[in-house]
Amino acid sequence: MRINPTTSDPEVSIREKKNLGRIAQIIGPVLDVAFPPGKMPNIYNALVVKGRDTLGQEINVTCEVQQLLGNNRVRAVAMSATEGLKRGMDVVDMGSPLSVPVGGATLGRIFNVLGEPVDNLGPVDTRTTSPIHKSAPAFIELDTKLSIFETGIKVVDLLAPYRRGGKIGLFGGAGVGKTVLIMELINNIAKAHGGVSVFGGVGERTREGNDLYMEMKESGVINEQNLAESKVALVYGQMNEPPGARMRVGLTALTMAEYFRDVNEQDVLLFIDNIFRFVQAGSEVSALLGRMPSAVGYQPTLSTEMGSLQERITSTKKGSITSIQAVYVPADDLTDPAPATTFAHLDATTVLSRGLAAKGIYPAVDPLDSTSTMLQPRIVGEEHYETAQQVKQTLQRYKELQDIIAILGLDELSEEDRLTVARARKIERFLSQPFFVAEVFTGSPGKYVGLAETIRGFKLILSGEFDSLPEQAFYLVGNIDEATAKATNLEMESKLKK
């Protein structure tokens, strides 16, 4: 009796159940795959190519279906390098979009776009997974209440407050403290809100990703001894990855964040560094798929792609995802379609200033350039709004007087202007504060300052109550009581020296 090969061979029986196609064409990171008639995969389905290259090395490439071409062919974008692939190789249709691990098992770990751990710390529990392509929450699920997301960082909470479930753009060059600010926010959301964070490294330098991981371990944001106590999950798709991976890594990070929001009902911080690279990767893929380019060579689907990512970042009645996105501005041109499309989605901008960093004022957030749609009396209340406006006016006047001071000196100013300058310098220093994550380097303990304390402190400085105190007393302290205590200590020290 002859044995039926299709039932005896386990490999064949698996393929019978799964949809099987063959590679018809390879154009860099884009594959055309032919399937049997009537067995076409859906758009966004994951396809897996397994086999061996000419040297006998194992190949395992995952792709995502982007177009149905007709003649039983689909065009797919690879999520990893396509070296070693050949025409005629078997391709398995997984029957669903890419799915990644979600939940507590992801904390303290580094993943790639496919949700595979890349930190050499062993496998991750994959019993709970979620597809990366989803619709945004329905209107009925959204939380429409406007509320401030308190960060415990004075300059942010007072002058450019974040919205709970909002989107914030983080602008700043190299070396002005972007990473430290990101780490402090991750630390504070865990302590004050019982929340977790997800960091999506989209198309940035591998070295920076590694540095961030090392710094997080050093500062305790990632707990190596007990990973479950870590406060962040990391997802990296760096510069050396194919455009498909860079285009989808933001969605992988967002999917992990959505689980914490919808199932664990937590407040989540989602960091995307850098949102421009997401657009850039989409532009590369668009050209490879043969779409006609739009303005400045960008993809014609730019607004749609950006919208499908940004609309999933929101507050629901269960929890919230507050997103902080680093924005690279090509050639400092804010009218470029990529940053211009991003701005349409932002609720607040935090601008880091090299001038403040050079003065040693950290966080180096520019109080005059940073903006927020939340800074309105009906949202934050009259007291907060008035205090913020007075702080900005005082700092603006100081900025205008700086040229005169540089040429003629302080003595040539009127009495009123001299008082404004003295208060502005105190405000500038009081906007600095010691960070928890920088304790390891500075030796001074970090401070979390509540919004009410922040407003009280600045009101007292503006009222002139502390005009007699030295400005040094306001530098790197938490609330105003610490500034007065520091002033007393400075006075004692100067008396002892005499």
UniProtKB/Swiss-Prot annotation:
Keyword DNA repair part of the UniProt annotation: no
Gene3D superfamilies: 2.40.10.170, Bovine Mitochondrial F1-atpase, Atp Synthase Beta Chain, Chain D, domain 3, P-loop containing nucleotide triphosphate hydrolases
Subcellular location: Plastid, Chloroplast thylakoid membrane
GO terms of molecular function: ATP binding; ATP hydrolysis activity; proton-transporting ATP synthase activity, rotational mechanism
Positions where Phosphoserine occurs in the chain: 13
Assigned EC number: 7.1.2.2
CDD domains noted in UniProt: ATP-synt_F1_beta_C, ATP-synt_F1_beta_N, F1-ATPase_beta_CD
Annotated binding of ATP, by residue: 172-179
Predominant cellular place of this UniProt entry's protein: plastid
Alphabetized UniProt keyword annotations: ATP synthesis, ATP-binding, CF(1), Chloroplast, Hydrogen ion transport, Ion transport, Membrane, Nucleotide-binding, Phosphoprotein, Plastid, Thylakoid, Translocase, Transport
Catalytic activities: ATP + H2O + 4 H(+)(in) = ADP + phosphate + 5 H(+)(out)
GO cellular component assignments: chloroplast thylakoid membrane; mitochondrion; proton-transporting ATP synthase complex
InterPro entries in the record: AAA+_ATPase, ATP-synt_VA_C, ATP_synth_F1_bsu, ATPase_a/bsu_AS, ATPase_alpha/beta_chains, ATPase_F1/V1/A1_a/bsu_N, ATPase_F1/V1/A1_a/bsu_N_sf, ATPase_F1/V1/A1_a/bsu_nucl-bd
An individual GO BP term: proton motive force-driven mitochondrial ATP synthesis
Membrane topology designation: Peripheral membrane protein
Primary enzyme class: translocase
Family, per entry: Belongs to the ATPase alpha/beta chains family.
Database matches in NCBIfam families: atpD
Protein name: ATP synthase subunit beta, chloroplastic
Natural source organism: Draba nemorosa
Lineage: Eukaryota, Viridiplantae, Streptophyta, Embryophyta, Tracheophyta
